[in-house]
Amino acid sequence: MEFPFSLIIQWLSDFLLPLVRISSMIMVMAGIGAKTVPTRIKMGLAVVTTFLVVPVLPPVTFNNLFSFEMILVVIQQLLIGVAIGFASLLMLNTFVLAGQILAMQTGLGFASIVDPSNGMSVPAVGQFYLILATLLFFVFNGHLMMIQMVVHSFAVLPIDGNWWAVDHYWDIVTWGGWMFTTALVLSLAPLTAMLVINMSFGVMTRAAPQLNIFSIGFPFTLVAGLVIIWATLGNFVTQFEFQWLKMVELMCTLVGCSP
């Protein structure tokens, strides 16, 4: 049985172009996109996911594989997939940054471990928050929601060679500012508590100059930091849920869905 060349090209377009968007999202998304996950597993998951969702996707109208326009279409699919996965990565990095800010202010920053995702030495508090956020990401079915978002994006942003509006690119740029602002807000309550403790040490120094504040203050600050982290863990799920909704809102601005 022979297949026409045009039919083979159509089959390749229907599979390869969605594969580019889905695989780029999986390579970047939180949890699965980490460097600790082997690339073969990521690509295998991308191929299986693409194979399952291709039958329900709109037909690809752009099937000219051997042209310069095809290169632009592939770049477009890469950008869309990376942008969708980048939103989930920013959400997790928000908690990492909040943990690092808290570690620096409480004196716990000296406790560092090597982050296997990037090979750098980072505060243990930030990694602790990252582990909690990653577990909650899968508890909230974040991996399934990411696949749902990228599949929905094919209906709103079909593979036709048309690019995003300029506002969408600016939205992606502003996500970085949102991450730093949110991390500061998450660590604001512990930072306020540490500020009160440091002010009390200042009052003690003025009241009793002979008191060696360095031998007392540093151990007390460490213990207070651990107590503050323990006290704020009860609100961690609530904060994650709020950031989760914000992440969904960010992705919906790209794929045109309702949060």
Describe each PLM feature range.
Residues M1-P259:
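Hydrophobic alpha-helical segments and their helix-loop boundaries in membrane
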